[in-house]
């Protein structure tokens, strides 16, 4: 028997509102910002996301064995090329996305967190 349910995945960042807007656009969600240091993104299929201000935030580096990425999000998409175009237009950057034969591509969000666009 479970003792808990999963709430939102909370992501540290320097600008919660900006990063929430990025993911809301990618996922088709809605930004809820009652406090500028904590911003929620809801209204899309899947686990909700929350973004919290982190003073002194240092983004992860990809790939780097001596400094872990700590987590990444797998975002399931129908059209990899269209999703990549949209993600890049919203401020993502490519990390490992040149091999078009794989079923995933790795990017960084505007705050530097890695995420994957996955065919699915």
PLM segments and residue spans:
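Short, charge-rich, low-complexity interaction segments located
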Residues: 48-49, 60
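Generic beta-structure capping elements
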Residues: 44, 52-56, 120
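Short connector loops at helix/strand junctions that flank enzyme active sites
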Residues: 36, 44-46, 66-70
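Vicinal oxygen chelate
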Residues: 2-8, 14-16, 33, 40-41, 49, 68, 73-111, ...
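N-terminal beta-strand motif that seeds the catalytic metal site of vicinal oxygen chelate
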Residues: 1-20, 26, 71-77, 118-119
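A short, acidic/glycine-rich surface segment
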Residues: 56-62
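Glycine-centered loop/turn motif at secondary-structure junctions
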Residues: 27-28, 91
């Amino acid at each position: 028997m479970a003792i808990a349910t999963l709430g939102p995945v909370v992501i540290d960042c320097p600008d919660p509102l900006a990063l929430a807007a990025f993911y809301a656009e990618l996922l088709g969600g809605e930004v809820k910002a009652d406090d500028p240091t904590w911003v929620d993104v809801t209204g899309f299929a899947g686990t909700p996301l929350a973004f919290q201000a982190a003073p002194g935030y240092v983004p992860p580096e990809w790939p780097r064995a001596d400094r872990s990425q700590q987590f990444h999000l797998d975002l399931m998409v129908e059209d990899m090329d269209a999703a990549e175009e949209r993600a890049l237009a919203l401020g993502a950057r490519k990390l490992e996305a040149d091999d078009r034969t794989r079923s995933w591509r790795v990017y960084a969000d505007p705050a530097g967190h890695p995420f994957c666009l996955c065919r699915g």
